[in-house]
Amino acid sequence: MKVLGIETSCDDCCVAVVENGIHILSNIKLSQKEHEKYYGVVPEIASRLHTEAIMSVCIKALKKANTKISEIDLIAVTSRPGLIGSLIVGLNFAKGLAISLKKPIICIDHILGHLYAPLMHSKIEYPFISLLLSGGHTLIAKQKNFDDVEILGRTLDDSCGEAFDKVAKHYDIGFPGGPNIEQISKNGDENTFKFPVTTFRKKENWYDFSYSGLKTACIHQLEKFKNKDNPTTKNNIAASFQKAAFENLITPLKRAIKDTQIKKLVIAGGVASNLYLREKIDKLKIQTYYPPLDLCTDNGAMIAGLGFNMYLKYGESPIEIEANSRIENYKNQYKRKNNEKNFSNA
């Protein structure tokens, strides 16, 4: 079965063709450079650019896969969570294709797509612990299957990637913040500043994260940095921030591994491409799986791959389904019961 995967939850316009849930025939992504001067994604610009680009990106994906649109068996599309305007563009495009081609459509949760991505590269047996790190999400989950996910902990404020972007903006390091901070940190001293690392002691927040304190502490160094008599460089600030940002992850992650007794770890999301983070994780001495770089960031392949499996198990989504920018109380919503409705159709 050939699945066309469409992902437009933020600022990347992504379309892919995947066969039988794992064989990637094409994986095309168009990143929107227009946001760089704003040091962040502008929702109105993102949705407009998706509208302009999605048809050409789809054509490129089909051409790369050597596949005619009539040969597509299923259309998978991200319907939640994300920027509502961007989601609507992708969802309406997918609906139009489904109706005109008389093909089934399956709507996919962006978070579950990221958690599925590593499975397209490595054969990983369930159960395992997943750590999702992206610009919009930071969470730890216990996975027993592609659709059996229990979120153990999540950020209570900023995501890890969002904190990188905001610090980079204040220090004029560039957007996106993650790769730019990683790059200049290589020439910095990570011990110049001791930024705060948040650890929760309450049972209900045992596996949770917080990045607002770290972000604020780093930004408060800005005035000292501007002082001409201060020898501190951007490299040192970036390196010190990066060190604290990833130390912030380690304690909750260790707790999850210890408490669940699960000895396999899967890292997903755009921040997973950070090599400094991978060095930190490798020190945990646990079997760890990373997706290739093109599956770390937003992509259509993960949506198509998960869509194949969701469709086989649950069937198609109703054509009336609407995009949803948020998932209220999502930590609890991902706890499934037997025969419960598909996440994507919730």
From Swiss-Prot:
Which Gene3D superfamilies does its entry note?
3.30.420.40
Cofactor note text: Binds 1 Fe(2+) ion per subunit.
Q: Which cofactor does it need?
A: Fe(2+)
What cellular component GO annotations does this protein have?
cytoplasm
Broadest EC class? transferase
Q: Which residues bind Fe cation?
A: 110, 114, 298
Binding of substrate occurs at 132-136, 165, 178, 274
Domain of life from the UniProt record: Bacteria
InterPro entries recorded for this chain? ATPase_NBD (IPR043129), Gcp-like_dom (IPR000905), KAE1/TsaD (IPR017861), Peptidase_M22_CS (IPR017860), TsaD (IPR022450)
- Keyword Cytoplasm appears in the UniProt entry: yes
Its recorded reaction(s) are: L-threonylcarbamoyladenylate + adenosine(37) in tRNA = N(6)-L-threonylcarbamoyladenosine(37) in tRNA + AMP + H(+)
Give the E.C. number(s).
2.3.1.234
Q: State its location(s).
A: Cytoplasm
Q: Which GO terms describe its molecular function?
A: iron ion binding; N(6)-L-threonylcarbamoyladenine synthase activity
Q: Which HAMAP family does the record match to this protein?
A: TsaD
State what protein this is by name. tRNA N6-adenosine threonylcarbamoyltransferase
Provide the species name: Borreliella afzelii (strain PKo) (Borrelia afzelii)
